[in-house]
Amino acid sequence: MSPHNTCTLQITRALLSRLHILFHSALVASVFYYRFSNFSSGPAWALMTFAELTLAFIWALTQAFRWRPVVRAVFGPEEIDPAQLPGLDVFICTADPRKEPVMEVMNSVVSALALDYPAEKLAVYLSDDGGSPLTREVIREAAVFGKYWVGFCGKYNVKTRCPEAYFSSFCDGERVDHNQDYLNDELSVKSKFEAFKKYVQKASEDATKCIVVNDRPSCVEIIHDSKQNGEGEVKMPLLVYVAREKRPGFNHHAKAGAINTLLRVSGLLSNSPFFLVLDCDMYCNDPTSARQAMCFHLDPKLAPSLAFVQYPQIFYNTSKNDIYDGQARAAFKTKYQGMDGLRGPVMSGTGYFLKRKALYGKPHDQDELLREQPTKAFGSSKIFIASLGENTCVALKGLSKDELLQETQKLAACTYESNTLWGSEVGYSYDCLLESTYCGYLLHCKGWISVYLYPKKPCFLGCATVDMNDAMLQIMKWTSGLIGVGISKFSPFTYAMSRISIMQSLCYAYFAFSGLFAVFFLIYGVVLPYSLLQGVPLFPKAGDPWLLAFAGVFISSLLQHLYEVLSSGETVKAWWNEQRIWIIKSITACLFGLLDAMLNKIGVLKASFRLTNKAVDKQKLDKYEKGRFDFQGAQMFMVPLMILVVFNLVSFFGGLRRTVIHKNYEDMFAQLFLSLFILALSYPIMEEIVRKARKGRS
């Protein structure tokens, strides 16, 4: 059966968005007409005008996402003839077993091994950038358990193929109405899984194993060779452990360098035309995800220029009261659909199926570098260069397994990329620490397209951050990296405009400059309460027709956001939480990310990779599920937040007192209202501040 996919334009949503753009633009124009007509009203007025110009600039960029939203669907992926399916490699990257629990990593590995895909066409690679003895030891045991698990899943067509998730209470509904053979086999595989977990737990307690080794030679080990699957045995995919060489003082280019190493190593061992990239804490939740992606990659209309299929990041541990917006609803349920209606979504850090050759050339000439300067582009390995050609099987024929492994050690060496185009024109770029986002941007600029699929059943599930510090560190990292791109020679306003559509350029410009929200909120957060405290009016008085323009912009923005939240299946409470966390992120993570990018630009700081802690603390999780903010470890971010919250609280009551005394209610009405609105949003933060203060005194 031929793969089938559909792309449906969301006509109602697009029409409403375009009408809103016209209406809101008229209101914004009215506001600025009023501001500039009264521009001589003092420095506070000028600062407020500048802040509003910044906000209007970002708002204008955002409208590109709303111009042509589409929804895609696939049909009959499970009916695709296995002979039609191309080879697929799965790349899973881990870096530190202390921050990325090794049991979570192994669940991701085992779930990938159990994908509904021909075993002889599937290969799973684990990149251990920490070179940890623990990870290498445990993956061998994972392969032993994996053979039982893959066999069990295939025999009974198990839908949830992450063992940890399958044996949890979430999957009780899947384990009913089965015969005795199933129950016996399930009991057997469960006992093996429990034994595996105990083994991992005991090994993790050994301090000599749970370490990161930053001075080491390269190591490539075939944990399980799919070619050795015997007749009548469970067919399990190729499983490979890779720890590239690392030496002190050498720039290893973080995750981008790790994936480029995997590209070379896998090029000799499996050389699949497509690969899936997964975060180490994100497991395969739907075994048909690869087949669904192939419904696009095998489509003759899309295939020649299609670089990647992107799935949303969905998390199993986000609560209904998602105070940190861990699910990133605005991105995955609004913005990505909007970009998909242009030439495709931005590449996320995980859950995407990418065409290997897209990283080596352009859609119209994928082999240009291979043909014109193979050694300069791809390095000195003749065997690897041979693997890039059309006759790969012929090129590698006659090489023994030991010879291939010896060559992979060379490909994983830290000096292999010296004087080559790796990291610039070949593979993932090293110009930005946000390797996937930047890679997707460059692919679009080369002429490639992408598609976005948001199926009803999540194809991949991960673990979201559940405390303030980790959530803000993540946003700070993204802001710094994206601002860095925005002010570089690859800025969407210069580099992209001549290579992709204006609308898509504006989408990327939004990602690059959304950190400027910090400027708007910092000015508003200081000037507005200060002027209220001093009795200086910054808005038209109550009853003045010009106030309707300001009120219109405010209400129009809130209603647009509310519509998007409700239409994506969320609640009013989710809308309120998003309003709050938007402000918090802007005056904390975006502010520090902006400063970090500026310091990197002038050379005061050097950009460094910050690994997010993925180990979940039960106490923090309990706070998160109760809707309480956790400020532990987030002192750096809390300083500007607490100062502005307390300042706004003091200025509101001080300004209200002054207004009552002077009876200038009409002049100060708008400022009092905005201050009260911010206080309402800030209430949970003030509550946590008071709670911590009481706890500190007791």
Swiss-Prot record:
Superkingdom per UniProt: Eukaryota
- According to the UniProt entry, what is the EC number of this protein? 2.4.1.-
Quote the tissue specificity entry.
Mainly expressed in flowers and flower buds and, to a lesser extent, in leaves, stems and roots.
Q: Where is the active site?
A: D129, S436
Ranges that cross the membrane: 14-34, 42-62, 478-498, 508-528, 546-566, 581-601, 636-656, 669-689
In biotech or industrial settings, the protein's use is given as: Soapwort saponins possess anticancer properties and are also being explored as enhancers for endosomal escape in targeted tumor therapies. They may also serve as precursors for vaccine adjuvants.
GO cellular component entries: endomembrane system; membrane
Please give the biological process terms from Gene Ontology that the record holds. cell wall organization; cellulose biosynthetic process; glycosylation; saponin biosynthetic process; triterpenoid biosynthetic process
Q: Give the metabolic or biological pathway.
A: Secondary metabolite biosynthesis; terpenoid biosynthesis
Q: Where in the cell is it found?
A: Golgi apparatus membrane
Any one Pfam family here would be: Cellulose_synt
Q: Which UniProt keywords apply?
A: Cell wall biogenesis/degradation, Glycoprotein, Glycosyltransferase, Golgi apparatus, Membrane, Transferase, Transmembrane, Transmembrane helix
According to the record, glycans are attached at N38, N317
Q: Name one GO molecular function term.
A: glycosyltransferase activity
**UniProt keyword Glycoprotein present:** yes
| Membrane topology according to the record | Multi-pass membrane protein
Quote the record's binding site residues for UDP-alpha-D-glucose: K99, E100
Main function: Component of the oleanane-type triterpene saponins (e.g. saponarioside A and saponarioside B) biosynthetic pathway, leading to the production of natural products with detergent properties used as traditional sources of soap.
Family recorded in the similarity comment: Belongs to the glycosyltransferase 2 family. Plant cellulose synthase-like G subfamily.
**Sorted alphabetically, which PANTHER family does this protein's record hold?**
X-BOX TRANSCRIPTION FACTOR-RELATED (PTHR13301)
Q: What is the official name of this protein in its record? A: Quillaic acid 3-O-glycosyltransferase CSL1
Q: Which organism is it from?
A: Saponaria officinalis (Common soapwort)
